[in-house]
Amino acid sequence: MRKKMLGMFLAGVLAMTALTACGETANGNNGAATTGDQNQDQPADGQTSAEPAGDGALTGTLNLGVIGPMTGAAALYGNAVKNGAEIAVEEINAIDPAFQISLDVQDDVHDPEISVNAYQTLKDNKVQVIVGTVTTSPCLAVSAEANSDRVFMLTPSASSPSVTEGKDNIFQLCFSDPNQGSASAQYISDNKLATKVAVIYNNGDAYSTGIYQTFKSKASELGLEVVSETTFTDDTATDFTVQLKAAQDAGADLLFLPIYYQPASLILKQASDMGFSPKMFGVDGMDGILTMEGFDTKLAEGVILLTPFSADAEDEATANFVKKFNDKVGETPSQFAADGYDCPYAIYRALEFYAAKNGGLDVTDMSYADLCEILISVFTDPSFSVDGITGQGMVWDANGEVNKAPKAVVIENGVYVGM
């Protein structure tokens, strides 16, 4: 019953929102994609525009870049995306030897300046399309460069609206921050999870602040009482006693945490130490807490997350991915790994779609600018959709946002369980 209720309400909440996904099939029976204006930029050095293959086939080798934190505090996210993308590329390359993807992964250490340097390295390496960046602040910096250069980017997990705003070549596969905030409030209200809600968020982080703002607005609209709103910054993310005491004194029976898993792990530990045990509700940034080194997963028992991916889903595509990821990494994949897997598939299906509608496509040595215009035309084509492990029938709008329904999962006995 809970699954049915969740599916009905989330479909309504997000039916008109935009987000992304990719996967095994593309549906495009009505209307062909168009290339648009391909003269907005000159080809990269040594690159030329590709000619149609003539038979509807997709051929050649696509140089695909990935940017994310492979080291540093956010490395769990970056490596999850990298490993997911590598599995997808291996599968795609096995489908047809006439079309191959070459993957180039660059570390940005979750730093905007380093991320821009990584982007320049990818351009120097003749990369044509980019999956990334993984986190929001670096993506804001890189997306500005890519928009100016006319390089197509599909970010697996940078969820701020500012990432795509005013940039027609930047697309998201993840939920946008506003959608996460409003959907969370709706779910809490519809399922009567709380009478009094407290919020702890990072007011120095665009991701956390964006989700908080739309959560607060939607909660007010729904009559959901928010009794405590406290903040922290990256520099103060060690002691949450004051924030937890404020929530406890206000009588909160649910704590909404639109934050990443590192500070969330400390909040769970410190709440337990002080005997404060409200329901805990997070969003996609908390995914990964179960694999955090040194974290006692018993502290996360009963935590609810809103996410596009559930590793315990019973469909064949998810089961196959979970097995391959576990064989490769030795752990259950997170939502970030699933996003990383879906991104190369979305790009692959888009190129297939274009080739089928335009007599073929050979991407070898094709300029990133020409590929950018092709991918924009396909991703915004109403007849193009993608089925992936993070969503079925996903479509994009002209703002680069994807439309897909989230899933609620609860942590039970150290694993995610669909609700």
Predicted segments, located by residue:
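C-terminal motif of bacterial Sec signal peptides marking the signal peptidase cleavage site
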Residues: 17-21
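Extracytosolic ligand-binding ectodomains
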Residues: 23-419
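Positively charged n-region of N-terminal signal peptides that target proteins for export
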Residues: 1-10
